[in-house]
Amino acid sequence: MKAFVWTLSVLLFLLGSGHCKGGQLKIKKITQRRYPRATDGKEEAKKCSYTFLVPEQKITGPICVNTKGQDAGTIKDMITRMDLENLKDVLSRQKREIDVLQLVVDVDGNIVNEVKLLRKESRNMNSRVTQLYMQLLHEIIRKRDNSLELSQLENKILNVTTEMLKMATRYRELEVKYASLTDLVNNQSVTITVLEEQCLRMFSRQDPHASPPLVQVVPRHSPNSHQYTPGLLGGNEIQRDPGYPRDVMPPPDLPTAPTKSPFKIPAVTFINEGPFKDCQQAKEAGHSASGIYMIKPENSNGLMQLWCENSLDPGGWTVIQKRTDGSVNFFRNWENYKKGFGNIDGEYWLGLDNIYKLSNQDNYKLMIELEDWSEKKVYAEYSSFRLEPESDYYRLRLGTYQGNAGDSMMWHNGKQFTTLDRDKDTYTGNCAHFHKGGWWYNACAHSNLNGVWYRGGHYRSKHQDGIFWAEYRGGSYSLRAVQMMIKPID
C-alpha cells in the first residue's frame, strides 16, 4: 500500500511538470501578443516558472522498479538519493532489530531451560512437601490416639478411685453398725451382771462379793484398715476418757429393751465429678452439698479426696483437719503428718504436703471452728494462710485475726511443724512429747488442736495434752469438736 502511494506521488509530480511547461508556452504566446514591442532578450527574462513541493514519502517497504520502456535518466529522476539513504537506514535498523531478536531468542532459550528446571524442582518440592504433610498428619493422628488412650486411662483410674471411696464409705458404715452392736452387746452384758447380783442379794440374803472389773465382751475398736496410713505412736489407748480405767466398761443404769435400731448411719454425699482445684471451684461448678470431693491442685500431678464443707454460709470451704469423736489417734510421726491420715467422713488430717500444695496455688484464708461440750460454737478466722515447703519444715504463715474465739494461733505464726520424731520447736524439750500431737509448736502451745480427745471438757492429765484453745476455755479444757478450713480470699 505504501509503494502504491509512493508511485502515485511520482506520477503526480511528472504530470505537474508537464502541465507547467505547457502553461509556460501559453503564457509566452499571450505575452507576445500583448507586448509585441518587447525585445527577445527581455521576453526571455520575464518567463515565469512554477515549483511544486510534493511531500517526501518514506520508503518502508520493498521498491519495485520497472526498467522496461524507461531509460536510466527517467529512473534516476524517479529515485532520489534521500530515498536510498532512507532505504539504507531502514535496512540497518532492521538488521539491528534482527540481531536484537536473535539475542532475545538466545536469552529466551536459556530462560526456557531454567523454567523447565524450576518446574522440575517445583514438582520434586511439591512431592516432598506432600510426603512431609502425610508424615505430620500421621504423627498428629498418633498423638491424638495416645492422648485419647491417656484420657481413657485417667478416666479408668478415676472410676477405680471412685469405687474405692464408695467401698471405703460402705466399710465405714459397717464399722458404725459394728460399733453400735458392740456397745449394745456390752451394755446387755453389764445389765445381765447387775441383774445376777440383784438376784444373789435377794435369794441368798448374803452380802455380795466384790466383782472383778467388767471387760468388754466385744472389742470396742476394730482395725481401721481404710485409714490413710498405719503406724500409730502409742496406740489407740491415748484416745480415752480420763476418768475410766483402761478396758473397763462403766456400770450404766438399767436400760429398757430397745425397739428400734440403736444407731444412725450418717449420710455421706460422694461427688463423682471433678477433679476440682479446691472446694470453692466445685461450688462454683454447681455442687452445693457437703461431702467427699475429688481435688487436684494446679501445681500437683496427684489426686486427693477430702471433705468440702458447704453448710457454712457461703460455703466452698476445704477441710484440712477435723476432730469429732476421738476415733483417730493424732499422736503420730512426721511421715504420717506429711501424707495425712484418718477417715474423710470422720476425723482426719489432710497431710502437710497436700495442705502446702493447696495453700500455694492461690491466696487462701483460714477459719477454725470450735465446739465445746455445751454445744456452743465459736470461730477464729485469719485473713491469710499458707505453708512453706518441706525444706522449711512446713513453716506456718498467718494473716490478721478476727472472730469470737480469741486469738490462740498467732503465738504459732512463723513456726515450723514439730512431731515426736522431728523436734523443730523453740522449747528445750520436745513439745510434741508433752502435748501428744503434731503442731506448729512454739514454747510450747497456746493451741493444741491435734492433741488427745478427752470426753467431758475438763480433764486430768500430767501435761496439757488435750484439744484446747487457750483463749477459749483455757488449756485444761478439751474441746468436743474442731475443724480447720481454708478458702480462696474473695
Swiss-Prot record:
Q: One Pfam annotation, family name?
A: Fibrinogen_C
**GO molecular function terms attached to this record:** signaling receptor binding
Q: Where in the cell is it found?
A: Secreted
GO annotation (BP), single? cell surface receptor protein tyrosine kinase signaling pathway
- Which Cys-Cys disulfides exist here? C279-C308, C431-C444
Which spans of this chain does the record mark as coiled coil? Answer: 79-167
- The answer to whether UniProt assigns keyword Transmembrane helix to this entry is no
Which residues does the UniProt record annotate as the domain Fibrinogen C-terminal?
Answer: 270-490
Query: Sugar-bearing residues?
Result: N159, N187
Task: Output the InterPro entries linked to this UniProt entry.
Answer: FIB_ANG-like (IPR037579), Fibrinogen-like_C (IPR036056), Fibrinogen_a/b/g_C_1 (IPR014716), Fibrinogen_a/b/g_C_dom (IPR002181), Fibrinogen_CS (IPR020837)
Which parts of the chain span the membrane according to its record? none
The record's CDD domains line, in alphabetical order, gives: FReD
Superkingdom of the organism of origin:
Eukaryota
What's a single GO CC term here? Answer: extracellular space
The protein's predominant localisation is secreted
Keywords associated with the record: Coiled coil, Disulfide bond, Glycoprotein, Secreted, Signal
Please indicate if the UniProt record lists Iron as a keyword: no
Q: Where is the signal peptide?
A: 1-22
- Check the record and name the PANTHER family matching this protein: FIBRINOGEN ALPHA CHAIN
Instruction: Kindly provide the name given to this protein in its UniProt entry.
Output: Angiopoietin-related protein 1
Organismal lineage: Eukaryota, Metazoa, Chordata, Craniata, Vertebrata
What gene does this protein come from? Angptl1
